Amino acid sequence: MKHVGSYEELASFTSVKGNLGFDTVFEAVFMIFGPRLNIAQRYVDLLANTGIERGLLGPHEANRLWDRHLLNSAVVAELLDPGDRVVDIGSGAGLPGLPLAIARPDLQVVLLEPLLRRVTFLREVVAELGLDVEVVRGRAEELWVRDRIGERDVAVSRAVAALDKLTKWSIPLLRPGGQILAIKGEHVFDEIHQHRRVMASLGAVDVMVVVCGANYLCRPVTVVLTRCGQQMRHKPARVGDRKTQ
């Protein structure tokens, strides 16, 4: 993990690097997944077939599942402590939650996803891979979701929403001092500037930008890291009735 404070500094990490000590993507894959590489490979196979067939990923993603999706997600594990309780908000096809669970079996991972077709896929994948991962169909803003999954140490997300919405959804699911880890793109500082006041009003503190995987990825991953303030926490409004899981 590297802390960055400007676009110039971020560019020095996220531009393509040619000499990282790894000749192929698969060397980085082996470093990250190690003895669980066969599980990661099976997940890639499921994404490339069932995932694309059901429209969870576009067909053009099939040839870049390892570098663009699995590695991009799994390197966030650099920011997680042993045994962390993690919720993946808007998990979609299981990103970043499933790569994290594969790379770090010590984590307690919940995949939170509102759409039935995605939830069905996620439950099939979890069963197929034999992962100790819970899949919950629901939205982060629903009160029963917090009751179901409890207060988490970390809320992760990838390509889900802007930081104001992510903060609103994440804070009620976190313990005091818990972390929000949002994988973001090249306009991250503009987004922070735009939403910082709203984030602070919702209880987010210590907002920073970090990059993960700088030692072994050609394009390290940009993550917004912020914490749930100790004193200010908002409970979600009750939305609808409890859904059948």
UniProtKB/Swiss-Prot annotation:
Binding-site residues for S-adenosyl-L-methionine, renumbered to this chain: 90, 95, 140-141, 158
Gene3D superfamilies: Vaccinia Virus protein VP39
Protein's cellular compartments: Cytoplasm
Enzyme class (EC, first level): transferase
EC number: 2.1.1.-
CDD domains with a match to the protein in the record: AdoMet_MTases
Record InterPro entries: rRNA_ssu_MeTfrase_G (IPR003682), SAM-dependent_MTases_sf (IPR029063)
One annotated Gene Ontology cellular component of this protein: cytosol
Organism superkingdom: Bacteria
Pfam families: GidB (PF02527)
Keywords: Cytoplasm, Methyltransferase, rRNA processing, S-adenosyl-L-methionine, Transferase
Gene Ontology molecular function, alphabetical: rRNA (guanine-N7-)-methyltransferase activity
Matching HAMAP family: 16SrRNA_methyltr_G
Cited function: Specifically methylates the N7 position of guanine in position 518 of 16S rRNA.
Family designation: Belongs to the methyltransferase superfamily. RNA methyltransferase RsmG family.
Protein name (record): Ribosomal RNA small subunit methyltransferase G
